[in-house]
Regions:
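ATP-dependent carboxylate activation and anion-phosphoryl transfer catalytic cores
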Residues: 1-35, 39-54, 58-64, 75, ...
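Structural motif
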Residues: 28, 70, 101, 129-132, ...
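Periplasmic-binding protein-like
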Residues: 65-71, 618-625
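A conserved helix-loop-beta module that forms one wall/lid of the active-site cleft
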Residues: 92-162, 647-708
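Extended, domain-scale alpha-helical bundle/helix-rich regions
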Residues: 473, 479-483
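Charge-enriched amphipathic alpha-helical scaffolds
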Residues: 487-501
Length: 777
């Protein structure tokens, strides 16, 4: 948590940049499902544990002259600190240069005490607080600070060890936990800033002291929630120009004082009663750097790598604009990032969000307005699927107020429910501390949806202006249909009859002031900008690749790895790959991985708009490299005569639909555990009577073992069946005790099947293969 695809993205870009300059780069990484460990990228790759011993061994064996630690997240920085503490930079690493960040800078930024002293020395304001190295010292500090207070561990990532304490009983336990989480047993105890506005500045600086703000990111959620768990937007919408300029100047001062002379950094601020407070900084590329790069098309990882080598901003050319990188991006669109949580897999877990990160992925929506951007992001994470039913569901006022007070992944939806229950913006703001500007925008969306329930369906669907107004708010066909009580197809047909389609605009750094040749596109129904010309389309044969969206449990870097390689393979074949994805952390959403990138929700509506635009010379759509996400729309695509390249949907269905799979195995005379398939509660209860316990119950069309259970009693089975939706069929299998599990990977070219590998699991059957230790051969 807190360290995912974004560091594979930044390190891969760094490797590519260094290689193009003629450097021989040696990579140390222990994660095999990354692009950066591909043989083609580094001169040599060591898939070994990342520890000081291996760093020293590689430096000696390979004659290493410099180390670039700013692309590997907290792991890389902490290893540098360990090497420093062990005295190796005065010994074995004496002649090795550290690029991007000096040891002194890392210590100043990551050590809470040193950072605070550094900020006070340059006259910047910080939350009042103190440091502690033991439980006794912590109790002394909290007497001065008072409650509620925020506890932060030094040298950790993703807010590990951080928390908010509201009383002395909570404080004792949380302080002990935070001290254990810090590798140097140091914690910072600060005044609470709960409810204050939070901002992040992505900054780059070169050796000549040229500084550029790449992006100002505003957190929609107030302080008290880790930025990785917050809904964020860019550019900032509620800052005054005076506040922005103060923050900009403070960011430059922070980089100078800490000593980030050649590279990128992330600086976080809070605003409390007109006080501008510095919260922390990361002296490296971060999760927010990847988001800022995708939001602005400013290649932070590449620029930070070149700056680390001593280049200046005026010397570095931006590949996209073909001009210098020494100017600050200007956006004429809004991006919204929504974090993805997988709490439903862990029903016992507390879903309250705090200063320690809990999300495992994120999606980004791009639109011409905040409303459109927000709704596209919510749609990208499939959070609007049951919005109509959720708003119809009666909730007690006290429960609603409690959920608005409590930071949680559904708080935005509870705000929508509050507006549907006639609560005012002021009331929701006083409970949630979300800025009234955002709440007013959300309220207008809810009012538009509620009006649909009373609308004359035929009149609305034949009125182009009304439908355009709804679409420009970011409302999907499916969402409009659910509130009208009709099928999504009817809304789509109405739009087609009215010739109402979104415009495709290019993401660029200059609000279309300079020509951008990069086909990195988003759709919008926002009013047309005359200066925006339609982006060019490829005249070569094209293939659309659909991505996997947000990282989830069971959907991680491995799908981005596959998607990226598929795109590169198509390029080698002379074809034009088009990627549809909405995950800002990934390499597949980098502007040069494909010939055209659409940063869009992976839904039938958006994919069909893209297919219609790219229909000339289109060979087909590939759904096999995005995990379960593209498979959800594969059937509809095939039904609309859009060719699916690779496995046909009827064959995907045989593999995913348990009953069809059993029929195939029977025809091939292959044995499998005795099992039955149920499509309703009644059928499931009948199957239960025919099978012996224990059972393994599995839905069709799921990934990562979602909702799969091993059940050993009839009562457990009855409870599971009672709560199962039966949207897809349920397979009820006899569970094989003490069985050996194997994974076989194979590829087929219609004639031959080639077995690539056989993995043997150490754990017995019943433990998901993603959680099982395995070995080859």
């Amino acid at each position: 948590i807190g360290q995912a695809c974004e560091f594979d993205y930044s390190s891969s870009i760094a490797l590519k940049t260094l290689k193009n300059l003629g450097y021989e780069v040696v990579l140390l990484n222990s994660n095999p499902i990354t692009i950066n460990t591909d043989k083609a990228l580094a001169y040599k790759t060591y898939i070994e544990p990342i520890n000081t011993q291996n760093v020293l061994k590689i430096v000696e064996q390979e004659g290493i002259e410099a180390i670039l630690p700013t692309m590997g997240g907290q792991t890389a920085l902490n290893i540098m600190v360990e090497l420093h503490q062990q005295g190796h930079f005065e010994g074995a690493l004496k002649h090795v240069k550290l690029l991007g960040a000096k040891i002194e800078s890392i210590l100043k930024a990551e050590d809470r005490r040193a950072f605070k002293e550094c900020m006070l020395n340059i006259g910047l304001d910080l939350p009042k607080g103190g440091y502690a190295y033991s439980e006794e010292e912590a109790l002394g500090v909290v007497k001065e600070v008072g409650f509620p207070c925020i506890i932060r561990s030094s040298f950790t990532l993703g807010g590990e060890g951080s928390s908010v304490a509201f009383n002395i009983e909570e404080f004792r336990d949380l302080a002990k936990f935070a001290l254990e989480a810090s590798p140097i047993s140091e914690i910072l105890i600060e005044e609470s800033l709960l409810g204050c506005k939070e901002f992040e500045m992505e900054v780059v600086r070169d050796r000549k002291d040229n500084c550029v703000i790449v992006c100002c990111i505003e957190n929609v959620d107030p302080m008290g929630i880790h930025t990785g768990d917050s809904i964020t937007i860019a550019p900032a919408l509620t800052l005054t120009d005076k506040e922005y300029q103060r923050m900009r100047d403070a960011s430059f001062a922070v980089l100078r004082a800490v000593g980030v002379d050649t590279g990128g950094a992330n600086v976080q601020f809070a605003i409390k009663d007109r006080r501008l407070l510095v919260i922390e900084m990361n002296p490296r590329v971060s999760r927010s750097s990847a988001l800022a790069s995708k939001a602005t098309l400013f290649p932070i990882a590449k620029v930070a790598t070149l700056l680390a080598l001593g280049h200046t901003l005026e010397e570095i050319q931006n590949d996209i604009t073909q001009s210098t990188t020494c100017f600050e991006p200007t956006l004429d669109y809004i991006i919204t990032k929504i974090p993805h949580f997988d709490f439903e897999k862990f029903p016992q877990v507390d879903t309250t969000l705090g200063t320690s990160m809990k999300s495992i992925g994120e999606v980004m929506g791009i639109g011409g307005s905040f409303k459109e951007s927000l709704m596209k992001a919510l749609e990208s994470d499939y959070l609007l699927k049951n919005l109509h039913a959720f708003l119809e569901q009666p909730l007690e006022l006290e429960f609603l107020k409690k959920e608005l007070r409590r930071p949680n992944p559904k708080r935005l939806l509870y705000a929508m429910h509050a507006f549907s229950d006639s609560l005012s913006v002021d009331e929701v703001h006083s409970l949630s501390f979300i800025d009234p500007y955002f709440l007013n925008e959300i309220k207008e969306i809810v009012q538009a949806l509620l009006e649909l329930k009373e609308a004359d369906k035929q009149a609305l669907l034949s009125d182009k202006n009304t439908l355009f107004g709804l679409k420009s708010m970011g409302l999907s066909d499916a969402l409009i249909a659910s509130f009208l009580g009709i099928a999504e197809l009817e809304v789509r047909q109405a739009r087609e009859a009215l010739e109402l389609h979104p415009k495709m605009y290019q993401v660029d750094l200059s609000a279309n002031e300079f020509k951008s040749p990069t086909p990195y596109l988003y759709s919008t129904y926002a009013p047309f900008f005359p200066s925006h010309k339609a982006p060019p389309k490829s005249t070569r044969q094209k293939v659309i690749l659909i991505g996997s969206s947000a990282n989830k449990i069971g959907v991680g870097m491995e799908f981005d790895y596959a998607l990226t390689h598929a795109s590169l393979a198509l390029k080698k074949m002379g074809l034009s790959p088009i990627i549809i994805n909405n995950n800002p952390e990934t390499i597949s959403t980098d502007h040069d991985t494909s010939d055209t990138l659409y940063f869009e929700p992976i839904t039938l509506e958006h994919v069909l708009e893209i297919v219609a635009r790219e229909r000339d010379h289109l060979l087909g759509v590939v759904v096999g490299f995005g995990g379960q996400t593209p498979l959800k729309i594969a059937k509809d695509l095939e039904a609309l005569n859009i060719p699916l390249l690779g496995t046909a949907f009827k064959n995907i269905e045989i593999a995913e639909e348990r009953d069809l799979c059993h029929q195939l195995l029977d025809s091939l005379q292959i044995t499998y555990p005795r099992g039955l398939c149920a499509n309703s509660k009644t059928q499931a209860l009948e199957c239960l009577d025919q099978l012996e316990l224990p059972l393994i119950l599995r839905p069709s069309f799921v990934l990562g073992g979602a909702k799969m259970r091993i059940l050993r009693t009839k009562e457990e089975c009855l409870d599971y069946i009672e709560n199962y939706s039966f949207e897809t069929s349920l397979l009820m299998d006899s569970f094989l005790e003490d069985a050996l599990e194997l994974d076989v990977d194979a590829i087929c070219d219609l004639k031959s099947v080639f077995v690539c590998s056989v993995l043997e699991h150490i754990e017995p059957a019943g433990i998901h293969s993603g959680d099982s230790t395995c070995f080859i051969p």
